[in-house]
């Protein structure tokens, strides 16, 4: 099971929180879910160079609070906060709701699986050898404190006629251990030979769920 599913979804409510927090009845649920997708797609397309890993959305009545987790907060905020204000107004126009935006800086992007996947994909698009790109990403992550990392690339690697999957890993990535803090990221490299999928798993240590921690401290 742990080998097949997204490790983030498997750990929801255990060591990981939801990326969206709101409640809606049957009538409004699908519309609000679609609105979340539009918000995320718009922010990602607007801020391609900002290194955005995660977009957290909370809703209360007619107000939407958005937290953007980024490796380059300066790009999102802009000089004097102009860029983030423009983004806020555009999102209000898109949704018809009050929007507030909070920027969260990612201190070590080398330990963020989504950013690592996007970085490897960008290198593949620049025709960097896939083994070299994977090895460099793994080396940086391990150097900065990762307990383990696994990267897979799949597609027509190096222009081969037949698509295949290649892996590179270091350390351990315990996918079946639910208390393990495992981050997962996926990105695609669009090459002249077709798309190459990049998947990244990063194990950052164990997190003791709050209930177990409280009971252990008694």
From Swiss-Prot:
GO terms for cellular component: cytosolic small ribosomal subunit. InterPro entries: KH_dom, KH_dom-like_a/b, KH_dom_type_2, KH_sf_prok-type, Ribosomal_S3_C_sf, Ribosomal_uS3_bac-typ, Ribosomal_uS3_C, Ribosomal_uS3_CS. Binds the lower part of the 30S subunit head. Binds mRNA in the 70S ribosome, positioning it for translation. This is Small ribosomal subunit protein uS3. SMART domains: KH. GO terms for biological process: translation. CDD domains: KH-II_30S_S3. The keyword rRNA-binding applies. Pfam families: KH_2, Ribosomal_S3_C. SUPFAM superfamilies: Prokaryotic type KH domain (KH-domain type II), Ribosomal protein S3 C-terminal domain. Keywords: Ribonucleoprotein, Ribosomal protein, RNA-binding, rRNA-binding. The gene is rpsC. It comes from the Bacteria. It comes from Desulforudis audaxviator (strain MP104C). Residues 39-107 form the KH type-2 domain. HAMAP family: Ribosomal_uS3_B.
